[in-house]
Amino acid sequence: MGDKKSPTRPKRQPKPASDEGYWDCSVCTFRNSAEAFKCMMCDVRKGTSTRKPRPVSQLVAQQVTQQFVPPTQSKKEKKDRVEKDKSEKEAASKKNCHKKTRPRLKNVDRSSAQHLEVTVGDLTVIITDFKEKAKSAPASSAAGDQHSQGSCSSDSTERGVSRSSSPRGEASSLNGESH
């Protein structure tokens, strides 16, 4: 009786000898070279199991407590809060619907706008160039304050903010400095 073989179950085929230099990744099934310690596609270590890891008891307990937080407010207080939130959202949406606000930089002097038109083909783009605001100096350097208030344009050309087409040498000679 021990000599009978099950006809319904085929035997497992041995792997061909040509696969000796490779191993298949258990996650992405990529065929890696035998020298590779990690999968070249998904960086999973060689021999890593694809089984789901056991849940850590501390993590499970933490997730359970987060799921079942008991309600602390009464139904009446909750209802009042929901109505208040709705009225605030409606008021905010009414304010925003007729005025769109653009993000603005804080260190820009808006009164110093220069408009440049650039046309390429049939497309014209207007570039608005602003100068940087003069930074307020600390109270301890009174002499420095007087210098920075004397001439706004010379201050900006010294820092290289101006988009003048003149070279740096000419810009510094305009400030009263000689070389």
UniProtKB/Swiss-Prot annotation:
Residues 1-23, 47-117, 133-179 are annotated as: Disordered. A zinc finger (RanBP2-type) spans 19-48. It is found in: Nucleus. Residues 62-73, 162-173 have a biased composition (Low complexity). Binds to MYC and inhibits MYC-mediated transactivation. Also binds to MYCN and enhances MYCN-dependent transcriptional activation. Increases calpain 2-mediated proteolysis of YY1 in vitro. Component of the E2F6.com-1 complex, a repressive complex that methylates 'Lys-9' of histone H3, suggesting that it is involved in chromatin-remodeling. Interacts with MYC, MYCN, RNF2/RING1B and YY1. Part of the E2F6.com-1 complex in G0 phase composed of E2F6, MGA, MAX, TFDP1, CBX3, BAT8, EUHMTASE1, RING1, RNF2, MBLR, L3MBTL2 and YAF2. This is YY1-associated factor 2. The gene is Yaf2.
